[in-house]
Amino acid sequence: MRIQGQRIKKMRFIQTDHYVVAVEVEMVIPTDDPSEPCYEPETVEFLRQVKLHAEQSDLAWLKARGKVYAAVAA
């Protein structure tokens, strides 16, 4: 079920021990409560998948969906 409202694109950053992944996601400003944007269930599941693939170092999958940054030792 899609939430009714204005759709906006936002960049979200998913951080793990070895990577930071930047992905663009869609947020919705609901017409019933426009106080703040929210995620639809599909977007929440996508963000979970990004984190899971980052933890597994699945770089091919991650690069197909966003930008991948590697952590370096200080």
What spans do the regions from the language model cover?
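C-terminal-biased regions
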Residues: 1-55, 59-74
